[in-house]
Amino acid sequence: MTYHQQPGTCPTCGHRRGSRGKKWTIIVASIAVVGLIAAGVLNYFKIGPFSDKGKPVSFGQEQPGNGGGQAGGANAAKPDSKVLMPTGPAAEFKNTSTLSDGTQVAVTTLDGKKSGFKGKVWVWAPKAYKDPKFKDHGFPVMIALPGGPGFPNNYWMDDGGLHLESSVTKWYNEGKGKPFILAMPVLNPQPDTGGLYWDGSDIPGQPKMGTWLTEDVPDLIKANFRTVKSRDGWAFMGSSSGAFAGLKAVLKHPDKFKAVIASGPDIVPDSRLWNGHEKEKAENNPEVLAKQLIAANKPGTDVYLAFQYGTKESSVIPHVDKFIATYGNKGPVHTRLQKIEGGKHNAVTYIQGMDMGSMQWISEQMVGPVAP
C-alpha cells in the first residue's frame, strides 16, 4: 500500500528539519560569538586587521576655546572659569594600544615651538574624560617620565607591561587618586650611549629638554584636552633620571606645577654635559632650588614631593633620606616618603609604591575634575 503523506505532517521528518535548523542557528551564533571574542583578543594584543594600532585617535579636541584659553563653548564668556578648554591646534594622534575599557594610548610627534626639539609624546585620557557628566570639566594632568634611555620610547605608555593607565583608573574608582590625563614624552633627545643624558634640563649648547618638558609638552596637552587652568591640576611622576627631571621641574617652576612622585630619584644633576656650565648646573639642582624656595617662602608656592624607593636601593636611599631631612616639610616644601619593602630600582616596584599611598597623597593636594 502506498501512503501519501501530506506536506508537513511527518513528525519525525519535521522534527529532524527543525533540529537541523536549530543546530545551524546555534553553530552560526557560536561562530559569531567566537569571532567577536577573537576580534577582541586580537585587538587587545594588537594583532592583524582587528587592531586599532596606527588609526587616528580623537580626544574631542576639535573645538578650541576662545580667547587663548578661556573656557570654550557655553563657558567662553566666563573669564573666571577654572577650566581651560582645548586651545588648539589639534594634534594628529595615532593609536598605539587600546585598553580593556576602550580607552586608547595614542602618540604624536611634537615639534616643540619653545624648545626647538622635535620628539614623540604619548597621551592617554581616562574613561571619565568622556563621561557626559564631565563634558565641560577640566581634568588634572600628570607628566610621566621614564628612567633609562628615555628615548626613542617612554616605557610608561605600555599599559600591557606596567599598567600605569589601568592603575590610574583603578585608583580613581577606589577613591585613591585623581583621573589624570597622562602625558608621556621622550625624556632625552637621543639614546644614552655611553651614559650620556640631559638631566631634563636646558644645558647650554644642547637640545632644550627642560623647556620641552615644562612648556612644550604642557602646551600640547592644553591644545588638545580640557585641563585645569591653575597649577593645582598639574603634576609630574617619574623613575630614576625621570624622577630627577620631575622633581627639578616642580621645584624650579612652582608657579606651574604643584606635585611630583619621584621614584628612586637622582637628587643632583650629574650629566657630563654640564662641564663648564656650573652656574646653569646649580640653577637645575633640586637641593639649591629647595633651599631657595624655603628662603623665599612665598604664598602660593607650596609643592608636594612624594618620594619613593625600594628597600633594596642601597645607592638611592642615603641621598633621598638626606634631602628629606634637610629640606622636607620646611616652609612651602612638603614631603612624604614611601618605602617599598623588598623593592628594587625598577618601574614595577614604583607602581606598587604608588598603590601603597603615594598617588593618594598627591591627589589630595590637587584638584579635578573641575567644573567651569
What are the functions of these language-model segments?
Residues T2-P372:
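Non-catalytic cap/lid and distal C-terminal segments of serine-dependent acyl enzymes
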